[in-house]
Amino acid sequence: MTMEETVYFTELYDSYHGLLTDRQDSMLALYYEEDYSLTEIAEHYDISRQAVRDNIRRGQKAMEDYESRLHINAKRKKRRNLLLDLLNETNQETIEALLEIDGDVL
């Protein structure tokens, strides 16, 4: 997995871990937050490495499905970028764009 993919899934995990099954949540926490290898997770749960990999992949797919429907991560990134724009230069367009993300209207 590339560094970009790891960052992407870590961000998705931060947004959607509460929607995962308990098993997926705990395995993904070990994988992304604690930096456990598949082998270490397999030993922790006393299951095969392949079973861990399958659970992690299902969790990744579930998080991508949630993001495609809810767009929480995309909105967070957009909001962050717009707030950085505000720090550099306060303008009406940036404020309106920030409000539009959440469906608010001036």
Task: Please tell me what each predicted stretch does.
Residues 11-20:
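Short amphipathic alpha-helical boundary/capping segments
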Residues 60-67:
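C-terminal flanking helix
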Residues 27, 41-42, 52:
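Hydrophobic positions on the alpha-helical face of helix-turn-helix-like DNA-binding modules
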Residues 37-39, 45:
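Helix-turn-helix DNA-binding elements, focusing on the entry/boundary residues of the two helices
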Residues 48-49:
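Helix-turn-helix DNA-binding motif, specifically the short coil turn and the N-cap/start of the second
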Residues 81-106:
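Helix-turn-helix/homeodomain-like alpha-helical modules used for DNA recognition
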Residues 22-34:
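Short amphipathic alpha helix immediately N-terminal
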Residues 55-58:
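Residues within the DNA-recognition helix of helix-turn-helix
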